[in-house]
Design a protein with these regions (language model features):
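Conserved G1/Walker A P-loop phosphate-binding module
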Residues: 1-121, 139
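Conserved structured core elements
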Residues: 13, 28-33, 163, 167, ...
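Hydrophobic/aromatic beta-strand patches that form the interior of the parallel beta-sheet core
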Residues: 17, 91-93, 143-147, 181-183, ...
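Short, motif-level signal for alpha-helix interfacial/capping segments enriched in acidic residues
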Residues: 71-76, 161-165, 173
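Conserved catalytic network of the ASCE P-loop NTPase/AAA+ motor domain
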Residues: 81-86, 137-141, 172-176, 202
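Short, conserved acidic/polar surface loops in the N-terminal third of protein domains
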Residues: 101-106, 157-160, 193
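Conserved Switch II/interswitch segment of TRAFAC-class P-loop GTPases
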Residues: 113-164, 181, 187-191
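Canonical P-loop GTPase G-domain recognition
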Residues: 168-181, 186-212
Length: 212
């Protein structure tokens, strides 16, 4: 039995891919690429395909946080065909991610933004809401995890600012024994320093895969 058959058997064919990690790493961009490559081509109905395309999260460059809450994409699972005639019904789960120094959008006039959430009657800070939502995606809403990390080249935020948040996400996934892969997002994938980071990532996460 290959990995695809194993996943299909364990999940009865329904799979929720939780795309997690720090803010401003490219999580929404990963979801968009995945949807455009593997999901949209498998939707035969033109109207459903257009509606699903409209559900794809926005993404952008820079330091400003784009995602404000967890989101299931698409609204209904879509069957995709993988290797060896294995079929899976897939939904992606986007999240805000853990806040890192240098990111923008979670503060206003030097103070934490307050937001209303379905998890509390009282308003809470954007950062608190982001943490709760991200933990829920990791623990409650995903079958497998895709941890998106970056060398900082995609946002201009220093690489070191991401490390603590990355480690938190990976430690949480390991603590609940949830399978995951690590995706390294970089504007300079061919540079020696990026390849070195990938090797370091792979050596640390020896039981998991690290992709560009």
């Amino acid at each position: 039995m290959n990995i695809y058959e194993d996943i299909a058997k364990r999940t009865q064919g329904d799979i929720y891919i939780g795309v997690v990690g720090p803010v401003r790493t490219g999580k929404s961009t990963f979801i968009r690429k995945f949807m455009e490559t593997l999901v949209l081509p498998n939707i035969d109905n033109e109207f459903k395909r257009d509606r699903t395309r409209d559900e794809i999260p926005q993404s952008g460059s820079g330091k400003t946080i784009m995602t404000v809450e967890p989101k299931f994409v698409p609204a209904d699972g879509v069957v995709i065909e993988l290797k060896d005639a294995v079929s899976l019904k897939v939904r992606m789960v986007d999240c805000v991610g853990y806040i890192v120094d240098g990111a923008l959008g979670h503060e206003e006039n030097g103070k934490q933004r307050l937001v209303s959430t379905p998890w509390s009657k009282d308003a809470m800070t954007f950062e608190e809401a982001a943490e709760i939502g991200t933990k829920k995606v990791i623990r409650d809403h995903s079958t497998i995890g895709v941890v998106v990390i970056t060398d900082g080249s995609v946002t201009g935020i220093e690489r070191g600012n991401y490390i603590e948040a990355e480690e938190r996400v990976i430690d949480e996934l390991k603590s609940i024994q949830k399978p995951f892969v690590v995706v390294l997002n970089s504007m300079t994938p061919k540079e020696e320093k990026t390849e070195l980071l990938r090797k370091v990532c792979r050596s640390v996460e020896e039981n998991h895969l690290c992709y560009f």
